[in-house]
Regions:
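Transmembrane helical segments that form the transport core of multi-pass membrane transport proteins
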Residues: 226-313
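N-terminal alpha-helical transmembrane segments of multi-pass membrane transport
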Residues: 1-71, 77
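Alpha-helical transmembrane segments
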Residues: 170-188, 298-306, 329-332
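Membrane-embedded hairpin module used as a gating/binding unit in multi-pass transport
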Residues: 178-254
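Alpha-helical membrane segments and immediately flanking helix-loop junctions
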Residues: 91, 99-105, 120-130, 134, ...
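Interfacial helix-loop-helix linkers and transmembrane-helix boundary segments
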Residues: 39-48, 68, 84-85, 105-120, ...
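Intrinsically disordered, low-complexity non-transmembrane regions of multi-pass membrane transporters
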Residues: 1-19, 25, 71-78, 192-221, ...
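Entry/N-cap segments of selected transmembrane alpha helices
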Residues: 32, 110-132, 283-310, 361-365
Length: 385
């Protein structure tokens, strides 16, 4: 009987029930909420499902992301499964591969046809710099503030990339979760701001059809952008270079297999690895603290200011072009592709169902992807990374 009792006691102590804290249960509840939003309400399911499941796993079994250890005899013990996934985040491998996949799926035609979209895409990065100074005011050091501020660009991979490059790995989980959460909430956060700073007359403005873009222009675009941006800011090469390489695969027309692989199989594999590893970085000990709350608030402020900056410049462009530009497309300058462009289309269609703004909004939207990468490169240059 003693043996059986001891065995049962040992088994009981090996279960998660006796080893988890209240914080773990809170994080498990957050994971369930994310899964509900992703599955029931279709809030960015490709991102939220793996993130939520990684969050669930690490709070049931924290050792799944444990580091490699060496015992007193010098014997090395392997780390947890998610530790090896997470190394790919810290080394900026997964974010860069995500950018390649995004490039392979993106049509830069609307941006080429309307180069002024570059300016609106840049204006929507205002939230990044507002958040940077606010984060410093909140007590974060410069590198942490820079990593947090990228949330304002609504760009998860760039947030992870910069946090890793600046050595802010302890903040990577909260930053990534905040960035992806706000990306999924674009249709909820942006419309009130867009409507507040535009009149119904503004929202009804119809824009002229974009000019056709030649194949040669589409081929030259990624090459020129790579040379110009990477010469000015070499630190952007991993992100901008991979983004433009993926786009060159798409547009050159001679590497169909590479285009299909980059935009489908590789992209989804990387999303699984990135999502689960980011989710697994949100253990209760790492996530439930005051810094996380600050990051969530700063991220929301940054995102709102980014939307405001885009709409404000859209209003300026409307005045300069004598009413030829609908200011709603400015809000699409955040790099949540293509969600932000769809929101511009939806808000415009609410004012006038015959108004079709999607392709016009895609210009600032894809410009925002480049703009966020440039902002990250600027911070890396400032801090000598």
């Amino acid at each position: 009987m003693g043996y059986i009792a001891t065995t049962m006691s040992n088994l009981l102590h090996q279960t998660a029930f006796l080893n988890l804290t209240w914080g773990n249960y809170v994080m498990m509840l957050v994971a369930f909420v994310f899964l509900y939003l992703a599955i029931k309400h279709d809030f960015e399911p490709l991102l939220l499902v793996p993130i939520a499941f990684g969050m669930l796993l690490v709070n049931i079994y924290p050792e799944i992301i444990s580091d490699i250890t060496v015992d007193i005899l010098g014997v090395e013990h392997a780390g947890g499964l998610m530790h090896y996934f997470y190394i790919l985040d810290e080394a900026a491998i997964l974010p860069s591969l995500i950018f390649m996949g995004v490039g392979a799926m993106t049509d830069f035609g609307p941006l080429i046809a309307n180069p002024i979209s570059f300016v609106m895409g840049a204006a929507a990065q205002a939230g990044i710099y507002v958040a940077y100074f606010l984060a410093i005011a909140f007590g974060f050091n410069g590198k942490a503030a820079a990593a947090i501020s990228i949330i304002g660009g609504a760009d998860g991979p760039t947030s992870i990339f910069l946090a890793g490059k600046l050595g802010q790995t302890t903040l990577m989980g909260p930053i990534a979760v905040a960035a992806y959460s706000y990306m999924s909430l674009v249709p909820i956060i942006q419309p009130p701001i867009m409507k507040l700073f535009t009149s119904e007359k503004d929202r009804k403005i119809k824009m002229e059809q974009l000019r056709p873009v030649t194949q040669l222009e589409k081929i030259l675009f990624p090459i020129i952008i790579t040379v110009v941006v990477c010469m000015l800011l070499p630190t952007t090469a991993p992100l901008v270079g991979m983004l433009m390489l993926g786009n060159l695969f798409r547009e050159c027309g001679v590497v169909r297999q590479l285009t299909e692989t980059a935009s489908n199989a590789m992209m989804y594999i990387v999303v699984i690895l990135l999502g689960t590893s980011v989710g697994a970085s949100t253990s209760a000990e790492a996530f439930l603290n005051v810094d996380t709350l600050k990051i969530v608030v700063l991220g929301l402020v940054a995102f709102c200011f980014g939307t405001f900056g885009g709409v404000l410049l859209g209003q300026l462009m409307k005045i300069l072009t004598k009413g030829k530009i609908n200011p709603l497309i400015g809000s699409a300058g955040v790099s949540a592709v293509p969600m932000a462009a769809r929101v511009s289309q939806k808000v415009g269609a609410q004012a006038d169902p015959t108004n079709f703004l999607l392709m016009h909004a895609m210009g600032p939207n894809v410009a925002g992807v480049i703009g966020t990468a440039v902002a990250a490169g600027t911070f890396m240059a400032i801090y000598g990374v």
